[in-house]
Amino acid sequence: MKKYKILLVIGDGLGDRQVASLNGRTPLENADKPTIASLLRSSLVGLMDPIGPGIVPGSDTSHLAIFGLDPKKYYKGRGSFEALGAGAILTEGDIAFRGNFATVDSNLVVIDRRAGRKIEEAEDLVKELNDKIQEIDGVKVRFYHGTEHRVSVVLSGDNLSDKVSDTDPHEVGKRILNSEPTDDALSSKRTANIINALTRRIYEVLSNSQLNDKRVREGLPPANIVLLRGASIHTELPKLKDYTGLSGAAVSATALIKGVCKSLGMEVVTPPGATGGIDTDYMAKAEAAAKLLEDHDLVFLHIKATDAASHDGKVSEKVKAIEMIDRSIGRVLDRYGSELVVLFTGDHATPVELREHSGDPVPLMLYVPTNIIPDNVGDFNERQARKGSLKITGLNIIDLLLNFSNRATKYGA
């Protein structure tokens, strides 16, 4: 029996609701999708609750579920995924934080939580931090630049804990917060003290940086602090190959998603031009996915643009992103061939009028190049998906892919 290779395509934040400016249609309904339309002739269609009905997923928890790991068991926080995606090599027990370069005044009151967002000097500022802050109280400190204003911070040492609060006040006009232990463990108190000492040292280094002097002269906000949030302790996850038998690879430019995939032991590729935003090079990502299919059983193509447009409330950009995803799938089929299983869905809904994640179910399409009984739907969108046969959660996806690629093993005798 032929074993088909698998293309898993996730449009981040794909799901939506009726949009007033589209006369009650959704972005998926409004988008031109010729490739997807051609695949419907041999596809199962339906709705997926990434975690469960009504549960609002994060991108981290939803991707864990989609790859077959129950987030209620395996999710330990976002920080370590972000750090792995930014290039960190973590060992069991390391504590990782998400961070933002930000601007504060001399009283450490936040003026700009992202220091202008696009910081050309970010890589050099991270290098300066790594050169000048190598340890605090015997604990090794490492900084990693993600994208734009994003920074990951990793602590390595003994008696550390992730049970500490953020220093990020999450609002402009408020002073940065002292990190506090969130339980009674001595390791938590120690870690909070280290974080507070580290924050003071970061401010000292960045406030005296010539790179920030240059930014001020140019009328730009200085990136003179790193706001920390989302502490997580690194624990090893099961590897995709071990629990599915699938050799997996991923194409993504988003640090969080790259980190999740690295945690699962997947090869991760970010081609030139892939940005993790609406300006990404879709065709470069599609070409990379097609090439990876030559050597892997499953290739995951992640597109962040749909979510970015949704958070900005830009419906036309979300429609365009969906149309470019359609073209990307077509490019993979042109380059690799159509004898593969294709699953297209979102990791969660981000309605453009809401501008936030929601607990709405997400439409899902599963193309199988064999004689299945397809669902009789006229288009792929939220409305038509309600007529399809699939009503699943994220944890069902891997089993569906294994079954329809002829790789599943019997459950029982």
From Swiss-Prot:
CDD domains: iPGM_like. Keywords: Glycolysis, Isomerase. Its EC number is 5.4.2.12. The keyword Isomerase applies. InterPro entries: Alkaline_phosphatase_core_sf (IPR017850), ApgAM_prokaryotes (IPR023665), Metalloenzyme (IPR006124), Pglycerate_mutase_ApgM (IPR004456). The keyword NAD does not apply. One of its GO terms (molecular function) is phosphoglycerate mutase activity. It catalyses: (2R)-2-phosphoglycerate = (2R)-3-phosphoglycerate. It is an enzyme of class 5 (isomerase). Pathway: Carbohydrate degradation; glycolysis; pyruvate from D-glyceraldehyde 3-phosphate: step 3/5. GO terms for biological process: glycolytic process. Pfam families: Metalloenzyme (PF01676), PhosphMutase (PF10143). Catalyzes the interconversion of 2-phosphoglycerate and 3-phosphoglycerate. Belongs to the BPG-independent phosphoglycerate mutase family. A-PGAM subfamily. This is 2,3-bisphosphoglycerate-independent phosphoglycerate mutase. It comes from Metallosphaera sedula (strain ATCC 51363 / DSM 5348 / JCM 9185 / NBRC 15509 / TH2).
